From Swiss-Prot:
Propiece residue ranges: 17-136, 454-494
Organism: Penicillium rubens
InterPro entries (alphabetical): PCSK9_ProteinaseK-like (IPR034193), Peptidase_S8/S53_dom (IPR000209), Peptidase_S8/S53_dom_sf (IPR036852), Peptidase_S8_His-AS (IPR022398), Peptidase_S8_Ser-AS (IPR023828), Peptidase_S8_subtilisin-like (IPR050131), Peptidase_S8_subtilisin-rel (IPR015500), S8pro/Inhibitor_I9 (IPR010259)
Signal peptide location: 1-16
Enzyme Commission designation: 3.4.21.-
Protein name: Subtilisin-like serine protease Pen ch 18.0101
Length: 494
């Protein structure tokens, strides 16, 4: 979606980046507006300067409430005195943010006169127009096995013999919490085996349930018994999108804050069975400096973060949270080892994972499944893989215990062991890397020591690979048919 709103009396300065900046005074905080998503009228995210501490932020917010209340009162008086005059009621303060001691700010619904006063406050760094975010899935249905799991556990392209064979360490995901920041999750689904929990509902007035299915699907790919990469991880649903699959940038930032705080609280408990936290965000909108900073702050707090690259077949750097430098930005690949036709690309894309026709958990019943596509489906493969690798570290009460692997270290490790050069239709400025789980090994140190792998079939075409799969299927079919014929022949002979 294209579009942006600017204040009608302000000149618009458009930089080379996909963010428009509005400003009329050199000493006033700029108003940022994405040019690749739809702004929400009169809704803003305000970010403080680095020197502002929580106490000063609280004082500022008290001042803001006074300004907002006074303005509302003036508008009420004007409404009574002028026949036919009407004005929209503004909600005022909606969220406050303080993420891992790094990002400090708030969001709300304000009249432009109030925003002008906020802009001139010396504590304000910038203001961002709140905007729409949406899930990153593409609709399609196909009832087949989760080939994506098989693909990340094999180096070479899949054949009929290993098409649905997932090689993995049974303890994968144990002791790891996965925060799925999405539409919620069907926590009673049997595939979660009781490991799924409702974390937090951010949109005001929304129910504690997944009325969409998208978040449940992502959760299943991360940690489901049948459909998951890390089959023993715990899932925490953080609902930031409504049942229609869309929401606001400010709600998403608040969801990131909740996950970061939950992780920090869990880390401080000293539970020796707890190994770490991962997060997945299979959603996105236009470029948002605030959301990117929020994700980076959560990573600094210790969360291993995977985000979808986006489904616009465009440069991922123009979208958030895909542009968050400390997260792992994931593009989508197909069964034929090509970049999915919708997948974003570019230098902000770190790695690829299966994202076309992915089968996973769904809503409607505790056994429901669905097959959908998108970078939304690729990202949870990586979130699950992060949980998988984190869990392979020795337990904290073990004689072999080591220091926790940091998000920066694990991101580098994930990239270093990936399968290189196997994908087609990859632009020159995009890493040609496909995720790998170690081929079933439970030895994290050995997986790292073995390092990456350059695919032997890097130069084959998509048509060649499809042909290989079909040939393998035909050979397997004839082999099976021959075995059945032999059994019948032996039975007749007897």
């Amino acid at each position: 979606m294209k579009g942006f709103l600017s204040l009608t009396l302000l000149p618009l300065l458009v930089a080379a980046s996909p963010v428009a900046v509005n400003s009329i005074h050199n000493d006033a905080a700029p108003i940022l507006s994405s040019m690749t998503s739809k702004d929400i009228p009169d809704s803003y995210i305000v970010v403080f300067k680095k020197h502002v501490d929580p106490s000063s932020a609280s004082a500022h917010q008290s001042w803001l409430q006074e300004v907002h209340t006074a303005h509302t009162g003036r508008m009420e008086l004007k409404k009574r005195s002028l026949f036919g005059f009407d004005f929209e009621a503004f909600m005022g303060l909606k969220h406050t943010f303080h993420i891992a001691g790094s990002l400090l700010g708030y969001a709300g619904h304000f009249h432009e006169d109030v925003i002008e006063q906020i802009r001139r406050h010396p504590d304000v760094d910038y203001i961002e127009k709140d905007s729409e975010v949406r899930t990153m899935s593409e609709g399609s249905v196909e009832k087949n096995a989760p080939w994506g799991l098989a693909r990340i556990s094999h180096r070479e392209s899949l054949s009929f013999g290993n098409f649905n064979k997932y090689l993995y360490a049974e303890e994968g995901g144990e002791g790891v919490d996965a925060y799925v920041i999405d539409t919620g999750a069907n926590v009673k689904h049997v595939d979660f085996e009781g490991r799924a929990n409702w974390g937090k509902t951010i949109p005001q007035g929304d129910a504690d349930e997944d009325g969409n299915g998208h978040g449940t699907h992502c959760s299943g790919t991360i940690a489901g018994k049948k459909f998951g990469v890390a089959k023993k991880a715990n899932v925490y649903a953080v609902k930031v999108l409504r049942s229609n699959g869309s929401g606001t940038m400010s709600d998403v930032v608040k969801g990131v804050e909740w996950a970061a705080e939950a992780h920090i609280k869990k880390s401080k408990k000293g539970d020796k069975k707890f190994k770490g936290s991962v997060a997945n965000m299979s959603l996105g909108g236009g470029s948002s400096r605030t959301l990117d900073l929020a994700v980076n702050a959560a990573v600094d707090a210790g969360i291993h973060f995977a985000v979808a690259a986006g489904n616009d077949n465009a440069d991922a750097c123009n979208y958030s949270p895909a542009a968050a430098e400390k997260a792992i930005t994931v593009g989508a690949s197909t069964l034929a080892d090509e970049r999915a036709y919708f997948s974003n690309y570019g230098k902000c894309t770190d790695i690829f994972a299966p994202g076309l026709n992915i089968l996973s958990t769904w809503v409607g019943s505790d056994h429901a499944t669905n097959t959908i596509s998108g970078t939304s489906m690729a990202s949870p493969h990586i979130a699950g893989l992060l949980a998988y690798y984190v869990s392979l570290a020795p337990a904290k009460d073990s004689a072999y215990a080591v220091a926790d692997v940091t998000p920066k270290q694990l991101k580098a490790a994930l990239i270093s062991v990936a399968t290189e050069g196997t994908l087609t239709d990859i632009p020159s400025d995009t890493p040609n890397l496909l995720a790998w789980n170690g081929g079933g090994s439970a030895n994290y140190t050995k997986i790292l020591a073995d390092g990456g792998y350059k695919a032997h079939n890097a130069e084959t075409t998509v048509e060649d690979r499809i042909g290989i799969i079909i040939d393998s299927a035909e050979k397997a079919f004839h082999k099976e048919l021959g075995a059945i014929y032999s059994e019948i022949k032996d039975a007749v002979s007897v």
